[in-house]
């Protein structure tokens, strides 16, 4: 869906509609809280780009476009918990300067449709993601999905 706006000079502006975009401020607060408790980088994205990020490295990922591979995994409703050297590890961003040591990716589902993802990332070699990080992401994704209904 598209949103149609006009600017002051009367020009028409077309903008792709993002249901998560409506929750950007709220998603930002949720990402802040989750990043603080989990101790990692948290990104909340729609099906195109990051709409909220918090934690160490947030400035590098804010508003970055997600990779086609990630879009495909989300469309298939796949959750991912992977270490950087594992086969199931995927690059999260289209233009990703570095690989992360760990990633946890959970799709956000609203009224039966995938509308985005909650992504937890870590660059810390000493840290190990477990089912706990996956459950934290699932909790956030479930909550955000319900907020958009």
PLM feature spans:
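Juxtadomain coupling helices with adjacent low-complexity linkers
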Residues: 21-33, 64-72, 117-149
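A short, aliphatic-rich beta-strand micro-motif
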Residues: 102-109
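Short glycine-/small-residue motifs
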Residues: 53, 116-117
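Structured interaction and signal-relay segments at domain junctions
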Residues: 29-97
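Short beta-strand
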Residues: 4-6, 43-44
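Short, basic amphipathic alpha-helical segments that act as recognition/interaction helices
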Residues: 6-17
